[in-house]
């Protein structure tokens, strides 16, 4: 099994090619040598995400797939977005599960057979490894963090709507205890002087004997389409009802809100 717990994945396009091989039917995990690791899985090669109608991470993954399948470009019109959404739909609709369950399933003992590849946030994986080392005294080398060759970097914003909110914003930026807690949860902190986001987290991870994430500076930065077009594509792929939930063939809503933004 893998010894490194963080690494780049070579080409996201190659992964998508596996999912579309055999005339669109896709490869199975057993087809690409999973048996060499003592495992067997006849499911399709897909990356598991949360409910695409309700999960920000799943919607972002849709945007990543769309960007790559559109020649590293975004759709510019409703007609183009509709065509692209219909084309990538098979790469996404066979993978969703309730949002609160997806991450818990991934870290469960059965996770490697249910979801060999899962789309999660970097901070979730880092927090899991920090907790695992604290409990077991070692990293979980059965799980590896893969960075796609084309990816997004999300930067959450805190917008103060009151004096109390403004004070909270200052505390989050300056209070050592709050910053330490943020790093325990795997979050990067922006350095006020350099503007870099990795230095403090990398130092924290090194102190806790966790390998720090290292990604190539040459990797393609994927771009999301206009928000209205992205929402249109999500609705097309997920067949979402007006409340934002995916619907079954009988029109019954399924899915839940995501527990770890």
Model-flagged regions — what are they?
Residues 1, 46-49, 116-120, 146-147, ...:
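Structural recognition of the beta-strand scaffold that forms the well-ordered cores
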Residues 1-54:
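A conserved helix-loop-strand patch within extracytoplasmic ligand-binding domains
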Residues 3-5, 52, 122-124, 163, ...:
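Solvent-exposed coil/turn segments that connect beta secondary-structure elements
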Residues 45, 63, 154-158:
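Small-molecule pocket liners
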Residues 60-144:
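Ligand-binding pocket segment of bilobal, Venus flytrap-like solute-binding proteins
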Residues 123-126, 130-170, 176-180:
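Active-site/pore-lining binding-face segments in mid-to-C-terminal subdomains
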């Amino acid at each position: 099994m893998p010894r490194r717990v963080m690494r780049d994945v070579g080409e996201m396009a190659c992964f998508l090619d596996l999912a579309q091989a055999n005339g669109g039917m896709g490869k199975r995990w057993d087809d690409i040598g999973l048996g060499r690791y003592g495992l067997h899985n006849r499911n399709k090669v897909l990356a598991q995400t949360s409910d695409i109608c309700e999960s920000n991470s799943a919607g972002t993954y849709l945007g990543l797939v769309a960007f790559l399948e559109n020649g590293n470009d975004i759709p510019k019109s409703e007609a183009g977005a509709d065509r692209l959404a219909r084309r990538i739909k098979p790469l996404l609709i066979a993978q969703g599960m309730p949002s609160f369950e997806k991450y818990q399933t991934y870290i469960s003992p059965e996770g490697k057979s249910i979801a060999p590849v899962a789309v999660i946030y970097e901070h979730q994986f880092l927090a899991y490894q920090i907790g695992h080392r604290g409990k077991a005294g070692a990293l979980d080398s059965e799980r590896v963090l893969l960075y796609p060759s084309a990816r997004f970097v999300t930067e959450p914003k805190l917008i103060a709507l009151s004096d109390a909110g403004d004070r909270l914003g200052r505390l989050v930026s300056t209070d050592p205890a709050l910053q330490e807690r943020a790093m325990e949860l795997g979050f990067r902190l922006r350095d006020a002087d350099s503007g870099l986001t990795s230095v403090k987290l990398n130092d924290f991870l090194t102190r806790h004997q966790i390998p720090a994430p290292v990604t190539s500076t040459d990797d393609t930065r994927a771009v999301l389409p206009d928000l209205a077009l992205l929402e249109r594509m999500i609705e097309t792929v997920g067949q979402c009802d007006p409340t934002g939930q995916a619907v079954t063939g009988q029109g019954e809503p399924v899915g839940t809100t995501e527990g770890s933004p």
